[in-house]
């Protein structure tokens, strides 16, 4: 989440953008679904907390929106990417950087009924509200000219 006060006053206090952000492990992620025709919100779905730098793609198929993103369990990756931390050796037995998890969220369009009511995403038999596609990818690249907003492999 963003602390607006810190964002507005960062120049006075010489603080970086990471100080505008704060992590709340109890705060659910919200997916706001917007109608492409009129720009109105038509629904809100929630998921377990995660931190994301980069979205890969989103597309609609079979009455669902599929959203793929590179996700972290929390925002600790921000400080891990500081130059001083990247230049220093990792402690024995400690990982230097968190590994991203490429996740696919399936948002059921058939369950849109109230733009102001938050509805949790369905959880699978594994208890997760997403599918894990792979790990270790950041700065993803797909053929955007051909597949942006469309299904892909």
Predicted regions: what is each one?
Residues 1-153:
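Beta-propeller domains
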């Amino acid at each position: 989440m963003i602390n607006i006060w810190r964002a507005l006053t960062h120049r006075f206090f010489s603080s970086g953008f990471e100080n505008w952000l704060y992590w709340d492990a109890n705060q659910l992620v919200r997916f706001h679904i917007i109608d492409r025709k009129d720009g109105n919100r038509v629904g809100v779905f929630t998921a377990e907390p995660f931190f994301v730098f980069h979205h890969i793609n989103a597309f609609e198929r079979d009455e669902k929106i599929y959203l793929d993103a590179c996700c972290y369990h929390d925002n600790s990756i921000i400080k891990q990417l500081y130059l001083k931390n990247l230049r220093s050796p990792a402690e024995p037995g400690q990982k230097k950087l968190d590994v991203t998890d490429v996740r696919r969220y399936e948002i059921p369009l058939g369950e849109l009924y109230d733009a102001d009511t938050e509805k949790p995403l369905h959880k699978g038999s594994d208890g997760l509200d997403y599918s894990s596609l792979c790990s270790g990818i950041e700065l993803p690249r797909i053929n955007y000219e051909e597949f942006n907003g469309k299904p892909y492999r």
